[in-house]
């Protein structure tokens, strides 16, 4: 087999980063990204894009930390390059604050971000309702820039972007030899995974250019994340809620919570409401599977279920998915091909 034809289903940050990795690292392959929605209409476009990873009950912390470290290193290289502005990657410093001392005073990712330390008493005076805090510098990924930048890289490597709704992965055979499923919440329908479900997130995007530092409540529900074009104010976690229409009452509550952390936000203007459905799952699904139908076999690599952590671990999980794709490619190019998969 000469050129291996690879289809990546899904065009959010997981799909595009996986396609970019495969294009870059897998020799003699063609890559086509297939999705019914591309930027700016993906869930990833609503994401605040702060690199602060969550935990998942069924994903081991060492694995999660590796993905986060690889993602942080990848984006740090971009942030130090001339591509930083086009890719929408920059450093941002700030505080994570707690009303009481957390059980885990040092999170697993503390040695990956920059300058992680406990907040001083002087810093905590800014937040009188909080008694403990952490200060650090992390990266912010502006998805409105980063997703088009990834698309450009994919096309620059000879990849294709195809707007199409896939109802069944078997539609992609025999046109493709390997399928990479990065369909996020779509995997509930596409591969019948009932463990992936929506967690509705509503945020506000406001003009407040004087806000330079991020502020994040330790629970992660309330946050103020400054970006290059606007400040993201959040947020909500509504499990099982499929509603994509903004809730005006919730917007008022979010704004009130954020103003309690940063009173100057009362002067913010041009406030927009955004809603996204996070593809939540007990653990990220990153594995190979062989679909069998009669005599036909279709190698599939799954990479979905990142919930609120997609931006934080996208490159690390894309690298792992690419390693699985390479295993599939090796088997296809070996006599007695799919029997070993």
Curated annotation (Swiss-Prot):
<dbReference type="GO" id="GO:0006531">
    <property type="term" value="P:aspartate metabolic process"/>
</dbReference>
<protein>
    <recommendedName>
        <fullName>D-aspartate oxidase</fullName>
        <ecNumber>1.4.3.1</ecNumber>
    </recommendedName>
</protein>
<dbReference type="GO" id="GO:0005829">
    <property type="term" value="C:cytosol"/>
</dbReference>
<feature type="binding site">
    <location>
        <position position="311"/>
    </location>
    <ligand>
        <name>FAD</name>
    </ligand>
</feature>
<feature type="binding site">
    <location>
        <position position="307"/>
    </location>
    <ligand>
        <name>FAD</name>
    </ligand>
</feature>
<feature type="binding site">
    <location>
        <position position="50"/>
    </location>
    <ligand>
        <name>FAD</name>
    </ligand>
</feature>
<dbReference type="InterPro" id="IPR006076">
    <property type="entry name" value="FAD-dep_OxRdtase"/>
</dbReference>
<feature type="binding site">
    <location>
        <position position="44"/>
    </location>
    <ligand>
        <name>FAD</name>
    </ligand>
</feature>
<dbReference type="GO" id="GO:0005737">
    <property type="term" value="C:cytoplasm"/>
</dbReference>
<dbReference type="GO" id="GO:0005782">
    <property type="term" value="C:peroxisomal matrix"/>
</dbReference>
<keyword id="KW-0963">Cytoplasm</keyword>
<keyword id="KW-0274">FAD</keyword>
<feature type="short sequence motif" description="Microbody targeting signal">
    <location>
        <begin position="339"/>
        <end position="341"/>
    </location>
</feature>
<comment type="subunit">
    <text>Tetramer. Interacts with PEX5; the interaction is direct and required for localization of DDO to the peroxisome.</text>
</comment>
<dbReference type="InterPro" id="IPR023209">
    <property type="entry name" value="DAO"/>
</dbReference>
<keyword id="KW-0560">Oxidoreductase</keyword>
<dbReference type="GO" id="GO:0010646">
    <property type="term" value="P:regulation of cell communication"/>
</dbReference>
<comment type="function">
    <text>Selectively catalyzes the oxidative deamination of acidic amino acids. Suppresses the level of D-aspartate in the brain, an amino acid that can act as an agonist for glutamate receptors. Protects the organism from the toxicity of D-amino acids. May also function in the intestine.</text>
</comment>
<feature type="binding site">
    <location>
        <position position="37"/>
    </location>
    <ligand>
        <name>FAD</name>
    </ligand>
</feature>
<keyword id="KW-0285">Flavoprotein</keyword>
<keyword id="KW-0576">Peroxisome</keyword>
<dbReference type="GO" id="GO:0019478">
    <property type="term" value="P:D-amino acid catabolic process"/>
</dbReference>
<dbReference type="GO" id="GO:0007320">
    <property type="term" value="P:insemination"/>
</dbReference>
<dbReference type="Pfam" id="PF01266">
    <property type="entry name" value="DAO"/>
</dbReference>
<dbReference type="GO" id="GO:0071949">
    <property type="term" value="F:FAD binding"/>
</dbReference>
<feature type="binding site">
    <location>
        <position position="36"/>
    </location>
    <ligand>
        <name>FAD</name>
    </ligand>
</feature>
<feature type="binding site">
    <location>
        <position position="312"/>
    </location>
    <ligand>
        <name>FAD</name>
    </ligand>
</feature>
<dbReference type="GO" id="GO:0007625">
    <property type="term" value="P:grooming behavior"/>
</dbReference>
<feature type="binding site">
    <location>
        <position position="43"/>
    </location>
    <ligand>
        <name>FAD</name>
    </ligand>
</feature>
<comment type="similarity">
    <text>Belongs to the DAMOX/DASOX family.</text>
</comment>
<dbReference type="InterPro" id="IPR006181">
    <property type="entry name" value="D-amino_acid_oxidase_CS"/>
</dbReference>
<dbReference type="GO" id="GO:0008445">
    <property type="term" value="F:D-aspartate oxidase activity"/>
</dbReference>
<dbReference type="GO" id="GO:0005777">
    <property type="term" value="C:peroxisome"/>
</dbReference>
<dbReference type="GO" id="GO:0042445">
    <property type="term" value="P:hormone metabolic process"/>
</dbReference>
<dbReference type="GO" id="GO:0050877">
    <property type="term" value="P:nervous system process"/>
</dbReference>
């Amino acid at each position: 087999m000469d050129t291996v034809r690879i289809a990546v289903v899904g065009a959010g940050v997981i799909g595009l980063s996986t396609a970019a990795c495969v294009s870059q690292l897998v020799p003699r392959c063609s890559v086509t990204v297939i999705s019914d929605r591309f930027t700016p209409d993906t869930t990833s476009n609503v994401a605040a894009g702060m690199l602060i990873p969550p935990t998942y009950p069924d994903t081991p912390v060492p694995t999660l930390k590796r993905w986060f470290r690889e993602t942080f290193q990848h984006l740090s290289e971009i942030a130090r390059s001339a591509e930083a502005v086009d890719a929408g990657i920059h450093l941002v410093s700030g505080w994570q604050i707690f009303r009481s001392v957390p059980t885990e005073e040092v999170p697993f990712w503390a040695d990956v971000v920059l300058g992680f330390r406990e907040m001083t008493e002087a810093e905590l005076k800014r937040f009188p309702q909080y008694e403990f805090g952490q200060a650090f510098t992390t990266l912010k990924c502006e998805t409105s820039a980063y997703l088009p930048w990834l698309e450009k890289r994919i096309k620059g490597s000879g990849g294709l972007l195809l707007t199409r709704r896939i109802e069944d992965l078997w539609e992609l055979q025999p046109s493709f030899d390997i399928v990479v499923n990065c369909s996020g919440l779509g995997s509930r329908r596409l591969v019948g995974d009932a463990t992936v479900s929506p967690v509705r997130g509503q945020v506000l995007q406001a003009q407040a250019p004087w806000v330079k530092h991020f502020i994040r409540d330790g629970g992660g529900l309330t946050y103020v994340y400054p970006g290059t074009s606007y400040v993201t104010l959040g947020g909500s976690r509504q499990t099982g809620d499929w509603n994509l229409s903004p809730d005006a009452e919730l917007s008022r509550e979010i704004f009130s919570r954020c103003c309690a952390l940063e009173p100057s936000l009362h002067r913010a203007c041009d406030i927009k409401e955004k809603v996204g459905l996070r593809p939540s799952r007990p653990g990220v699904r990153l594995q190979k599977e062989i679909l069998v139908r009669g005599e036909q076999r279709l190698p599939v690599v799954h990479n979905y279920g990142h919930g609120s952590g997609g931006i934080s671990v996208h490159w690390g999980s894309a690298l792992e998915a690419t390693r699985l794709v390479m295993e599939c490619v090796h088997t296809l190019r070996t006599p007695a091909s799919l029997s070993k998969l």
